[in-house]
């Protein structure tokens, strides 16, 4: 037989914190091929061209982003009477340290690009920073009717 006398007490704490990282996105500039003449052939907008697309992603420093850039392979006429299309190809590059400078960008090398947000050079320990995604590419203008041709570029961002 055991005898136990005295006082016993215990304290348990269960603390749970849910921290949701935030990501803010903004189209700084749309990709724009402008007006082109039928049968012009290939028209390129290169990295650094004034008409390239620029997309900004603001996030917490050290946050990892998975960025996917998808697009249709052709531009379509907005007119219902015109079935013509324009072949369309794009490329993408990014900076991940809060500076909008295409000369310091890294080209996308895979379908899903893994990007780690770093602090800007002027304040490397800043809580927030930005990545810039640059969209550029080419269209091939054949013998097509005059019209407005459009297409979509979809940028998907998953943050971890």
Identify the meaning behind each predicted range:
Residues 8-84, 119-160:
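N-terminal small/polar-rich segments of proteins
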Residues 24-27, 86-92, 109-113:
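Generic structural motif
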């Amino acid at each position: 037989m055991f005898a136990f006398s005295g006082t016993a007490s215990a304290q348990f704490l269960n603390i749970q914190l849910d921290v949701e990282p935030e990501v803010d996105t903004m189209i700084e500039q749309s990709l724009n091929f402008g007006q082109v003449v039928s049968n012009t052939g290939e028209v390129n907008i290169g990295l650094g061209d004034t008409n390239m697309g620029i997309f900004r992603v603001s996030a917490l420093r050290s946050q990892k982003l998975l960025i996917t850039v998808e697009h249709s392979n052709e531009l379509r006429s907005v007119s219902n009477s015109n079935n013509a299309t324009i072949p369309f190809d794009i490329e993408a590059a990014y900076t991940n340290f809060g500076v909008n400078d295409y000369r310091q960008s890294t080209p996308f090398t895979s379908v899903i690009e893994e990007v780690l947000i770093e602090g800007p050079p002027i304040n490397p320990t800043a809580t927030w920073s930005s990545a810039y995604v640059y969209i550029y590419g080419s269209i091939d203008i054949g013998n097509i009717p005059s019209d407005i041709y459009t297409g979509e570029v979809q940028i998907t961002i998953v943050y971890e």
